[in-house]
Amino acid sequence: MDIPTDQRPTYQDFFDISEEGINIIANADIAFDNSLKNAEYLNENTCYALTRQELIGDRLVPFEQAHPSQGCKSGFSQDVWMFLGPIRMKDCHTVTAFSNTTGKYEEIPFTIGVPGCDNVLAAKLKTKYQVKNPAQHINCIHHHANQKRVPYSHRMTGGPTTWGIIHQGNIPISGL
């Protein structure tokens, strides 16, 4: 579904256009395999916040194994958000973030792709949903052509912004 905007959409933009059925918000470089069928276990009170797997060659590698030098943990990274039915979130247009330029905290648009945005969203979602990370049951596959990263002007780490960690759960398919 397209969001009519001339800028990167905010999380609230995505939430506002959600409909009945399964709604998936994902980074543009994410794909799924047949394991996506396991989203059928989602209910209206649960959000799936999935940690990605890296596609290295022809092999899927867990997030934390693909980034060992960064000390990455799977609960600190989500690239996909799944909901059943209209998403019950409000006030997700802006967020407080640290400016790498000014060295101060300031309000910025709350968009996908800013370091820490997934953790801030996790904390917000926990106020309305049971948030689970069944990444062992639904493969969220990261297709990043190279490992170069664009420097970010802001980051959502520390300071006044609340973070949430969503650890992967090895939950039986019948109850994901």
PLM regions and their residue ranges:
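Conserved catalytic core of nucleotide-sugar-dependent glycosyltransferases
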Residues: 15, 30-123, 127
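A structural signal for short, well-ordered beta-strand segments and their strand-loop junctions
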Residues: 23-25, 47-50, 130-137
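C-terminal catalytic/acceptor-binding lobe
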Residues: 94, 99-103, 107-176
